């Protein structure tokens, strides 16, 4: 007979770090060209005026200006950058 108790191993105990998705610049905030506005998987938010779409669906400013979130119809959203006056 074993004189030490068998120790079971847990199959849990793993949790990956979050991917830091979401809004990086909010409506009304000033941005420079190249600033990341929104990180996402898929087009949760679409690119509007003066906003580029990266290959990983990151939205970024193409010009210096102010961020504005807008609606495209009833169920879609877009983000645009307009020059600050």
UniProtKB/Swiss-Prot annotation:
Organism expressing this protein natively: Geobacter sp. (strain M21)
Cysteines engaged in disulfide bonds, as pairs: none
Region (Disordered): 1-21
MF annotations from Gene Ontology: structural constituent of ribosome
PANTHER family: LARGE RIBOSOMAL SUBUNIT PROTEIN BL27M, RIBOSOMAL PROTEIN L27
Gene3D superfamilies xref list: 2.40.50.100
Family the UniProt entry places it in: Belongs to the bacterial ribosomal protein bL27 family.
InterPro entries, per the entry: Ribosomal_bL27 (IPR001684)
Statement: the UniProt record of this protein carries the keyword 4Fe-4S: no
UniProt protein name: Large ribosomal subunit protein bL27
Stored Pfam families: Ribosomal_L27 (PF01016)
Any one GO CC term of the record: cytosolic large ribosomal subunit
Keywords: Ribonucleoprotein, Ribosomal protein
Listed GO biological process terms: translation
Signal peptide start-end: none
Entry keyword annotation includes Ribosomal protein: yes
Coiled coil: none
């Amino acid at each position: 007979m074993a004189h030490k108790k068998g120790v079971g191993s847990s199959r849990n105990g793993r949790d990956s770090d979050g991917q830091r998705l979401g809004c990086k610049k909010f409506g009304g905030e000033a941005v420079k060209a190249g600033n990341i506005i929104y990180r996402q998987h898929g087009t949760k938010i679409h690119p509007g005026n003066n906003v580029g779409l990266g290959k990983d669906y990151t939205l970024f400013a193409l010009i210096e200006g102010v961020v504005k979130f807008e609606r495209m119809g009833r169920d879609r959203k877009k983000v645009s950058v307009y020059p600050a006056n």
